[in-house]
Amino acid sequence: MKSLKYLIVVLAVMVAASALAGVRTDAQMRRAANRVLKSSRPLEQVAYYPGMALYRQAGGGFAIISSDDNSPAVLAYSTNSTLSLSDDNPGFNWWLNATRKVMLQQQPRRETTKPDPSRFPTSVQPLLTTTWGQREPFKFMCPFDTYVSDLSQYGTYTPDAGHYSVGCGPLAMAQYMNYYKFPKHGMGEESVTVKYDQGDVTVHVDFEQATYDWDNMIDDYQGDYTREQGMAVAQLCYHCGVAAQTTWNSLGGGTTDQRIIEAFINHFNYNDTAHYVPRSRYDEPAWMEMIYSMLSSGNPILYSAKDINIPAGIIAGHNFIIDGYDENGLVHVNWGWYGVENGYFDIALLNVLQYTYDDWQAMYVGLYPNREHLPGDVNDDGKLGIDDVTDLIDFLLAGNSAGNNQADVDADGRISIEDVTTLIDFLLSGNK
């Protein structure tokens, strides 16, 4: 009997010890930051919150480290992005605030859900190359921020005028569509009403009359760009906003997940089975497995999150893109804020089934272009030719293996040299 009591006491002590978190010292956290950044450059601690410290290094790069040794050390990092900690980047601030809430709670020991190497690549490099934002030139066709009596000016490219910001939803849509370079033309029509003190103004877009100039959209607009390059991206952002029935005002541009889905399907010819799924329906392994599956297939993920301040009755929505992951299961996020604070983040720990905070999350699944063209029409010009062969070879040499359904000439679910030979054989046989 005494032995049994002794065993129970020992087990209870072991369980209690495993539940009690130790605290990482500043030196330990700095070492963890240097390891993940693969750098010995001096680190500046720019902020400390209960459970986590934020470090950045000169010349770019940052790491957010957990001080709770029940948690994996690295919560987020980037080897090149800047850490501004301003209020300007709403998506990053959502993640930071949600993570702070989690770290305030007593946590059981946890390990990050990593990609299963028998099913997924160890890591996926960021799929997006764009570092777009919501201000100039992206907003130069959005509604004016003050009333303009000449209604013909609305929806035109006017760099010298004041405009409402694009909004994170339309901007995320634009970056997502630019990845696929699809569509060339839109479908249908849509109108939205903008409210001013002087009266309402309704803006209208006929998407079928629009041509999206993908070749003139560049990755980075923070340097010099031509008028044509500015117009190309401004039109896309404006059309995304109207298609998603965005409400534009001094706070920016707001829309809903359902409207974004409907915009993709009804106006941009994306798969009509596309839908969004809330995280609350999934546990951590299932949620992360969905993410690894989509990314390893070459498809970025449009992600949605909300800050819900119940006492104040305020709901702030955010949209951004997850476009890669590392070997430790942290996902790469493009926040849509000019590349600022883009990096790898632990979103697995934001598990609404385990923690009691009011931050809603969802991701869009099945959101792919409806490519209704010939397999092999890689350049999307409506015919097959030697240009498609060279484009396909360039596509493969760039290290791509997915993300362009038309490049999958032999329809085997992957893109490889066999697609090149199949296309050449097809052309040599006299087919076009």
Where are each of the predicted segments found?
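Structured segments of extracytoplasmic/periplasmic soluble domains
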Residues: R35-S39, D68, L171-P183, N266-H267, ...
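Cellulosome-associated attachment modules in secreted, modular CAZymes
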Residues: N370-K432
